[in-house]
């Protein structure tokens, strides 16, 4: 692993919390995200659980809907992989904000889902705000605790 990989790993290790914004890209994770993971994972500190217990918010968007019971159920190969990486490999505490149907209003074939997409958007925005407030609150507590040490 080169100096660039160590610098990326240092950023992860030094962070109080992480916010990862990763869209579904052609039913998987984008190549640059996979490359970033591969470079950071080469650092033994990351592979050794240096992020155990660290809060991570994964914000992800999907153009369609790949949930149970939909015609393309199981086509999301990004979110499950990211869960494995963040929870099982890194040992971090994962919170997911996922918004489906971002192509409604763009792709005419999805127009029938306009109302559902609006509901999904509202729910995702509310969940994102909740997680953001939680991270901010927890960060303030940690800074106060550290200042008192």
Where are the predicted features?
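A conditional alpha-helix N-cap/helix-loop micro-motif detector
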Residues: 1-2, 121
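Glycine-rich phosphate/pyrophosphate-binding loop and the adjoining helix
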Residues: 72-73, 82-149
């Amino acid at each position: 692993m080169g100096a660039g990989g160590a610098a990326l790993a240092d950023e992860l290790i030094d962070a109080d919390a992480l916010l990862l914004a990763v869209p579904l890209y052609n039913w998987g994770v984008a190549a640059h995200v996979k490359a970033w993971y591969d470079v950071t994972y080469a650092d033994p500190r990351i592979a050794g659980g240096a992020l155990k217990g660290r809060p991570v918010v994964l914000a992800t968007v999907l153009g369609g809907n790949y949930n149970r019971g939909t015609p393309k159920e199981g086509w999301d190969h990004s979110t499950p992989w990211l869960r494995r990486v963040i929870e099982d490999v890194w040992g971090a505490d994962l919170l997911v904000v996922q918004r489906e149907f971002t192509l409604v209003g763009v792709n005419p074939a999805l127009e029938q889902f306009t109302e559902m997409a609006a509901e999904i958007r509202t729910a995702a925005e509310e969940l994102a705000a909740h997680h953001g407030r939680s991270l901010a609150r927890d960060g303030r507590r940690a800074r106060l605790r550290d200042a008192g040490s």
